[in-house]
Every structure is written in structure tokens, then in C-alpha cells.
A protein has these predicted regions:
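Contiguous beta-strand segments within globular domains
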Residues: 106-134
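Generic helix N-cap/helix-start motif at coil->alpha-helix transitions
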Residues: 2-8
């Protein structure tokens, strides 16, 4: 019994040494299932399993490190095309905007503004400026072929008055925007009509600059959110390694105590 279990263990060790960690795990698991009474082989298998899991996590980390470097390279290549708005005193996380869409350049204009924070969370703001309120809480974007996308009612909207001008703003997060951001990105080279959805009808056309801003910020958001996802996976892999090391220490202490 032990002999057959040890043969399996040898196959597992060989797989481990050539870096085939899935095969090694599967061989160790089979010892437990096929030879439950081969205690020595099972014990050796458990010890090997900890080594296998450590190496597997290290391999994952190496892959994640190179993926993070690649994404960082993509980010560095385009970050200077954007303006980072961040008040160091009040904000831990700043927002990237397309230079053409800063507040100073767009006074008294009704348009869709796009931004992404440093953690990759993108949002769109529909801004309305006019002589009278329309009380809008959503927008619909329409392509020349009649296809369209429409936001749900914004959960974050407000209205104000400045020197007799009515200003309304409504925010929509990517993923809760009725795919309006994705639709604009897809149709960035086409003429897009914007219909503000409120008590009164209001329509405008997206300028080519606004369409390009949407696409550029969308691309940046994909890169930044991918970087955040990689960081999260790196943390998970490091935690797993920490957990395995603690398990190894415990086993070593138990063996000393047994002696």
C-alpha cells in the first residue's frame, strides 16, 4: 500500500520539479483518495502540497507583475493627454479629464462631460445651461442610423442659478449609465444627437471633440481599472503565500513537539 502511494508521490514530486503544479496537486489528491491508510505517504504529500501551492502562487505573482508593468506602460504612454484634477487637501483620489472638457473652457454650454478617477471608475455628467430649467435627470444619445442608448434616471443630480442662467447637472457611473458611454465610444466617428430627458425637451449635437474625449477617457478607464484588478489579485496571492507559510511553521512546530 505504502509502496503504491509512494509511487504516486514520486510522480507528484517530478511534476512539481518541472513546474506542472496542477498535475502535482492532482497526484497528491489521488493518494488521499486511493490510499487513505498510507499515512506516511499522505503526510509527505501534505508537506509537498504546501510547496506546490507556494510555487503556484509565486508563478501567479510573476505573471501578475509582468501584466501590471505592461498596463503601467500603456498608462504612461497616454496619461499626459489628460488633466488630473486633484485637491491634495480634500481629495485622496483625483479625476482625469480630457483637456477640452475642463470647466473653464465650457462655461454656458450644454454638453456631456466624461471623467475617470485614479482608480479607474468612470462617470459621465450631462450638463445643461439655459434661460429656463428643463429639470432633466437623464439623457438619450442617438446615432445617424436611429440606434440609441438611454440612461436610467440619475441618482445624483442638482440644479443651480448663476446670473439668470439655469444650470443643471446629472451624473451617471459607467455600468449604471444604460450603456450610453459604451455607445458613444462605439460611435465616436459618427454624428451623435443628445436628447435631455426632463420636463421640457432639449436637444443638442455632440461636438467631435466631446466624442473623442469620451473615447479617450473610456480607454484610460479600461487601463486604470485593469491595473486595480491586477493589484487586487496580487494582494490575494500574497495573502495565500502568507497563509501557507503560517501553515508550514505550524507543521514544523508540531513535528518538533512530537519528537
Amino acid at each position: 500500500l505504502e509502496k503504491k502511494a509512494n509511487e504516486k508521490l514520486a510522480v507528484a514530486k517530478a511534476a512539481y520539479e518541472r513546474g506542472d503544479y496542477e498535475e502535482a496537486k492532482s497526484q497528491i489528491d489521488s493518494i488521499k483518495i486511493l490510499y487513505p491508510k498510507a499515512f506516511e505517504a499522505r503526510k509527505a504529500g501534505q508537506a509537498l502540497m504546501l510547496d506546490v501551492e507556494t510555487k503556484a502562487q509565486q508563478k501567479t505573482l510573476a505573471y501578475l507583475d509582468s501584466a501590471f508593468q505592461a498596463k503601467t506602460g500603456e498608462f504612461n504612454a497616454i496619461k499626459d493627454k489628460f488633466i488630473l484634477e486633484k485637491d491634495a487637501e480634500y481629495q485622496q483620489v483625483g479625476n482625469y479629464l480630457h483637456p477640452a472638457q475642463t470647466v473653464e473652457k465650457n462655461m454656458h454650454r450644454s454638453f456631456l462631460r466624461f471623467q475617470v478617477d485614479e482608480l479607474g471608475n468612470m462617470s459621465m455628467t450631462s450638463i445643461y445651461c439655459g434661460a429656463g430649467n428643463i429639470h432633466h435627470v437623464g439623457v438619450k444619445v442617438v446615432a445617424p442610423d436611429g440606434s440609441f442608448a438611454e440612461t436610467p434616471a440619475s441618482k445624483d443630480s442638482y440644479e443651480t442659478t448663476d446670473m439668470n442662467e439655469k444650470i443643471e447637472k446629472a451624473d451617471y457611473k459607467l455600468g449604471a449609465d444604460g450603456n450610453v458611454i459604451g455607445f458613444i465610444n462605439l460611435n465616436k466617428d459618427k454624428n451623435i444627437r443628445v436628447e435631455y430627458l426632463g420636463d421640457r425637451a432639449y436637444k443638442t449635437t455632440m461636438s467631435p471633440t466631446d466624442r473623442q474625449a469620451a473615447a479617450a477617457v473610456y480607454e484610460l478607464a479600461q487601463i486604470l481599472s485593469a491595473m486595480q484588478q491586477i493589484k487586487k489579485e496580487q494582494e490575494e496571492a500574497n495573502l495565500k503565500i502568507e497563509f501557507i507559510n503560517k501553515k508550514k511553521e505550524r507543521k514544523a512546530q508540531e513535528e518538533v513537539a512530537d519528537k
